[in-house]
């Protein structure tokens, strides 16, 4: 069992307003992510990692929140999540998560006994915000943060991870990587979610 950690500290610059509380199909966008995590059988507890500027919005939704005072981007969020235990880390702007895919990744992580289990595309591109990380990686991340190095990909590649080839996954599972950056992305989302 692992923690489900939802990174929610971004400023939504391209979206034009707080995208995670933007109502999509009648509910805040972040709740799609939360509900998928709640449906995954291998997720023990869910926390939202938020910035000092937006954490109250998520608490008002009844979510457990950790405030990210580090403010060094996703790497800081992963670091904080790992203080609670092994974590499946995801962006709060990913409304198409597949609970079976989450459980599959966690199972692969548990089986591989590596510091991270990360989906990887054929071109080498990683999906660091749809990945499982070991609590043991926290000390390594701390060293990167102390050196001012904040690229999650560098931490992953230095940790001898378990890679999951994206091309081997069912097509429906690949939708999970879709994230909302701009309001135009909501139009793309309509092709996936029938509530529109």
From Swiss-Prot:
Task: Provide the residue positions that the database annotates as binding Mg(2+).
Answer: 93
Cofactor(s) demanded: Mg(2+)
Q: A GO CC term?
A: cytoplasm
BP term (GO), one = Mo-molybdopterin cofactor biosynthetic process
Q: What does this protein do?
A: Transfers a GMP moiety from GTP to Mo-molybdopterin (Mo-MPT) cofactor (Moco or molybdenum cofactor) to form Mo-molybdopterin guanine dinucleotide (Mo-MGD) cofactor.
Kindly list the places in or outside the cell where this protein is found, as annotated in its UniProt entry.
Cytoplasm
Regarding protein family, the annotation reads: Belongs to the MobA family.
* EC numbers: 2.7.7.77
Q: This chain belongs to which protein, by name? A: Probable molybdenum cofactor guanylyltransferase
Matches recorded under InterPro entries: MobA-like_NTP_Trfase, Molybde_CF_guanTrfase, Nucleotide-diphossugar_trans
Catalysed reaction(s) here are: Mo-molybdopterin + GTP + H(+) = Mo-molybdopterin guanine dinucleotide + diphosphate
Name the positions where GTP binds: 7-9, 19, 68, 93
Q: Which NCBIfam families match?
A: PRK00317.1-3
Molecular-function annotations in GO: GTP binding; metal ion binding; molybdenum cofactor guanylyltransferase activity
State whether keyword Membrane applies: no
Q: Which UniProt keywords apply?
A: Cytoplasm, GTP-binding, Magnesium, Metal-binding, Molybdenum cofactor biosynthesis, Nucleotide-binding, Transferase
- Notes concerning its domains: The N-terminal domain determines nucleotide recognition and specific binding, while the C-terminal domain determines the specific binding to the target protein.
């Amino acid at each position: 069992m692992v923690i489900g950690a939802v990174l929610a500290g971004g400023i939504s610059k391209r979206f034009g307003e707080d995208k995670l509380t933007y109502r999509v199909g009648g509910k805040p966008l972040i709740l799609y992510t939360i509900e998928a995590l709640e449906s995954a059988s291998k997720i023990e507890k869910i926390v939202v990692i938020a910035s000092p500027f937006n954490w109250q919005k998520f608490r008002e939704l009844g979510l457990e929140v950790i405030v990210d005072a580090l403010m060094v981007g996703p790497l800081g969020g992963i670091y904080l999540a790992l203080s609670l235990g092994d974590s499946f880390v995801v962006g709060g702007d990913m409304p198409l998560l597949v609970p079976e895919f989450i459980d599959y990744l966690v199972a692969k992580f548990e089986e591989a006994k590596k510091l991270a289990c990360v989906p990887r595309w054929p071109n080498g591109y990683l999906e660091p915000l749809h990945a499982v990380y070991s609590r043991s990686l926290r000390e390594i991340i701390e060293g990167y943060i102390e050196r001012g190095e904040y690229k999650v990909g560098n931490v992953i590649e230095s940790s001898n991870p378990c890679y999951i080839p994206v091309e081997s996954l069912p097509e429906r599972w690949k939708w999970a990587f879709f994230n909302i950056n701009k309001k135009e992305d909501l139009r793309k989302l309509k092709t996936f979610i029938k509530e529109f």
